[in-house]
Amino acid sequence: MKAFTQHTGLVAPLDRANVDTDQIIPKQFLKSIKRTGFGPNLFDEWRYLDVGQPYQDNSKRPVNQEFVLNHARYQGASVLLARENFGCGSSREHAPWALDEYGFRSIIAPSFADIFFNNSFKNGLLPIILSDEEVDELFKQVEANPGYQLTIDLQAQAVTRPDGKVLHFEIDAFRKHCLLNGLDDIGLTLQDSDAIKAFEGKHRAGQPWLFRDA
């Protein structure tokens, strides 16, 4: 998993509340358990005017020019600004996979759905909760200033605006540790690989009848 320490990136404003996981990555694309291949279909039903299908050539599809991620000024955005209850709906880890592959490193919103919130941390995506007032002000700032960027410092738990104002956010200490060190569930387990091997060796020696090759 990619570590997250500090990131400065262009902000794209998605001014919609209750964005659910089927809107983030529609159900017809959930045909793989690999973590790649979902970015091109992020927000597919909003980015395009037709109904997308797996393995389709998106370059030939009609684009919805009104959707924010299709605006020239937001190309290359890596910070998504959203409204409350982002990531609600059915549980699908493909949602943070799609956001990550598209290029987003962090999502800022007043609140998140619990399962999406947890899945994001496990996939190197940093969800940041700010107050309604802080998010409202950021939407105004982004709209008024093309090329608007934010700097996110996970160690300091701070979001710094271009004008120098710092917005602080809370994060669970364990999740912070994992993100700073790029540790997903597998990475955490591998940290104890020596202890696991020692246990397996002792277990095999003490109960050899449980093992076919003993």
Curated annotation (Swiss-Prot):
Q: Name one Pfam family in it.
A: Aconitase_C
Its recorded reaction(s) are: (2R,3S)-3-isopropylmalate = (2S)-2-isopropylmalate
> Which cysteines are cross-linked by disulfides?
none
Alphabetical list of Gene3D superfamilies matching this protein: Aconitase, domain 4 (3.20.19.10)
User: Which keywords, in A-to-Z order, does the entry hold?
Assistant: Amino-acid biosynthesis, Branched-chain amino acid biosynthesis, Leucine biosynthesis, Lyase
Q: State the similarity comment.
A: Belongs to the LeuD family. LeuD type 1 subfamily.
Q: What is this protein called?
A: 3-isopropylmalate dehydratase small subunit
